[in-house]
């Protein structure tokens, strides 16, 4: 009925029909044909593989020839079988690619795969290969250079969020860098000298990022806020007390310091006075705890570096006698672990750091070595790398965020070679990568886990930041995309003003004044009138000595040395009272008035002649 209506409508409108009729397909027949073709091709593939195995067993030395002959035979057999099948059934679809026919030994069911298709198993294998290669995780494709100064950058610190970088050096300066606020000019937004003329040894942000620990060459560590303003300063101990446990603070130069990873108010410092002390930000008057490293003989040794474990339970210190000593944070008397011969005695161990896992300890020694230790088996090192020159007492080493790599820098003499940043595999301890940084020593290195960027401090005053645009986050990527701000040009005058020379004050001639007024003015001037200086009343001043007696001390000095000698005749002074004593006796005369009324005086005899029998040494010398 519908067909008749369509034909009548088409005839009325003047054309033969509304279009071609839709073709119909027999899906079952097509599926059966495809299945048959797939089975036949699978058989051909199996036959070709069996022939290849037979040929390879006969001639095992030649590996390339059987595969090519096998492919030729496969093609030939495929063409012959295809010619035989073409007489019976028609092949539907394109032939399978050679990689599919040669790789899959199972029965192929379904239509052929495209030539560029890769199985999911192959993709997983490639991903595993990429994961096994740690070199690809090193973010060093791009770099920026921050000019700190001209002297060694001896301290680096990056806050936990990665927004601000702080650098310190041998020039006593501490510079603050804000990645979000910097442009392509890469200028620091603040520079200061918190410890005056002392070299900066260490800088570190707290785990909250609100304060910075500054350790310099003096004996008092400082804590600054994010903008560089002082928060607290540790007290200095009494250097005349022998027992360092009884002093309230350090008495000698500091060597290092760091924050507690869990407690935001606690930090630690080590010093040349032979102690490691813990402090609380809220109490600057006295240290919180003290640890005293000892040598084999029980004598105090100097700790050159110190650090906390990742969980904050242990405190580790590298000492000048080559030992590494680890204490439990709650027990300061005896060490928990120690290794006496970790490094060469007499050298400064420049860095001690824990891995993110917490069981592996890495040490950078002054004996040009880098070692890793398992604190559970602390007698012998896990791995040792030697020949890494170290000229600085703060040369760093640090772990990558995934604990697969260990990085450190090398020192070079001026003008001889380039300083390098070396990457070691933690397991095999093979050097797998290196970066030539600059023509100076590499002192500090820092790999931030959130930014995935590497910061390096060098011996020529540079701080370099290495990053990868694809793998790194924020940090240096924020400032390199900003254009450098143009300097503001001085505003020019839109209209030129003509100024007469004599209108300016410097060209004006002074007006003539009367002589009388000038004389009166000179008379009031004590210098021009030669006025004599008035006498000084009271104590002296201005280099002039005051009058005597102005003060109590001067009055005493004036009167204490007076000449009090009596020039009067003593005999006349006594005889003045003779008449009164004779008429009114009071002391001696009444006692002798009855027994001896008349006074009897001693008779004056002439000098007796000296006997001649006396020895010469007894005779009086006249």
Swiss-Prot record:
Q: Which GO terms describe its cellular component?
A: nucleus; site of double-strand break
By its UniProt entry, which Pfam families does this protein fall under? Answer: WD40
Where is this chain compositionally biased, Basic and acidic residues type? 36-55, 508-533
**Where are the annotated segments for Disordered?**
36-141, 508-549, 602-622
Question: Which InterPro entries does the entry link to?
Answer: G-protein_beta_WD-40_rep, WD40/YVTN_repeat-like_dom_sf, WD40_repeat_dom_sf, WD40_rpt, WD_repeat_GAD-1
What keywords is this UniProt entry annotated with? Repeat, WD repeat
The biased composition feature labelled Gly residues covers 539-549
| Biased composition range(s): Low complexity | 67-84
Q: Does the record carry tRNA-binding as a key word?
A: no
Q: Which stretches are tagged as biased composition: Acidic residues? A: 120-132, 604-614
WD repeats (start-end) = 148-187, 195-236, 249-289, 298-337, 344-383, 387-434, 437-476
Q: Which family does it belong to?
A: Belongs to the WD repeat GAD-1 family.
The protein depicted here goes by the name WD repeat-containing protein 70
Query: Which species is listed as the source?
Result: Xenopus laevis (African clawed frog)
């Amino acid at each position: 009925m519908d067909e008749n209506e369509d034909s009548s409508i088409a005839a009325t409108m003047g054309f033969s029909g509304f279009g071609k009729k839709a073709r119909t397909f027999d899906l079952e027949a097509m599926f059966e044909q495809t299945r048959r073709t797939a089975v036949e091709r699978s058989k051909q593939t199996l036959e070709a593989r069996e022939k290849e195995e037979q040929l390879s067993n006969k001639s095992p030395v030649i590996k390339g020839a059987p595969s090519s002959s096998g492919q030729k035979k496969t093609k030939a057999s495929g063409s012959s079988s295809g010619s035989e099948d073409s007489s019976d059934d028609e092949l539907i679809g394109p032939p399978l690619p050679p990689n599919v026919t040669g790789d899959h030994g199972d029965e192929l069911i379904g239509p052929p795969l495209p030539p560029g298709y890769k199985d999911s198993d192959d993709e997983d294998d490639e991903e595993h290969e990429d994961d096994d290669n740690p070199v690809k995780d090193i973010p060093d494709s791009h770099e920026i250079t921050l000019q700190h100064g001209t002297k060694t950058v001896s301290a680096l610190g990056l806050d936990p969020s990665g927004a601000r970088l702080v650098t310190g050096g041998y020039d006593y300066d501490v510079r603050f860098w804000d990645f979000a606020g910097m442009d392509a000019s890469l200028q620091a937004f603040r520079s200061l000298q918190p410890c005056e003329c002392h070299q900066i040894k260490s800088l570190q942000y707290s785990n909250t990022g609100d304060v910075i620990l500054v350790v310099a060459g003096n004996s008092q560590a400082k804590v600054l806020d994010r903008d560089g303003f002082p928060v607290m300063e540790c007290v200095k101990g009494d250097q005349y007390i022998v027992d360092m446990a009884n002093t309230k603070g350090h008495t000698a130069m500091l060597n290092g310091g760091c924050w507690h990873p869990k407690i935001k108010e606690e930090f630690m410092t080590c010093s040349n006075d032979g102690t490691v002390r813990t402090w609380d930000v809220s109490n600057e008057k006295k240290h919180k705890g003290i640890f005293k490293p000892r040598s084999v003989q029980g004598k105090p040794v100097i700790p050159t570096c110190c650090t906390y474990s990742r969980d904050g339970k242990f405190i580790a210190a590298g000492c000048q006698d080559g030992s590494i000593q680890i204490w439990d944070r709650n027990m300061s008397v005896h060490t928990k672990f120690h290794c006496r011969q970790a490094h060469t005695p007499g050298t400064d161990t420049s860095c001690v750091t824990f891995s993110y896992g917490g069981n592996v300890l890495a040490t950078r020694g002054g004996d040009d070595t880098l070692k890793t230790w398992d604190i559970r088996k602390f007698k012998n090192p896990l791995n040792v790398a030697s020949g890494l020159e170290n000229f600085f007492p703060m040369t760093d080493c640090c772990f990558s965020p995934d604990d697969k790599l260990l990085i450190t820098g090398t020192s070079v003499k001026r003008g001889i070679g380039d300083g390098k940043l070396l990457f070691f595999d933690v397991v095999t301890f093979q050097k797998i990568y290196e970066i030539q940084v600059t023509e100076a020593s590499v002192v500090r290195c820092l790999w931030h886990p959130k930014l995935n960027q590497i910061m390096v401090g060098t011996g020529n005053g540079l701080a370099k930041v290495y990053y990868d645009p694809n793998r790194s986050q924020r940090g240096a990527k924020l400032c390199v995309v900003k254009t450098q701000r143009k300097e503001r040009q001085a505003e020019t005058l839109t209209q030129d003003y003509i100024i007469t020379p004599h209108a300016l004050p410097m060209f004006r001639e002074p007006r003539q004044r009367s002589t009388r007024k000038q004389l009166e003015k000179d008379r009031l001037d004590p210098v021009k009138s030669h006025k004599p200086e008035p006498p000084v009343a009271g104590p002296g001043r201005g280099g002039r000595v005051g009058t005597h007696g102005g003060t109590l001390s001067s009055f005493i000095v004036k009167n204490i040395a007076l000449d009090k000698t009596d020039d009067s005749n003593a005999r006349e002074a006594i005889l003045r009272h003779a008449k009164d004593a004779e008429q009114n006796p009071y002391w001696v005369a009444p006692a002798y008035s009855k027994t001896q009324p008349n006074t009897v005086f001693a008779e004056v005899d002439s000098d007796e002649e000296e006997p001649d029998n006396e020895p010469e040494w007894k005779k009086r010398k006249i």
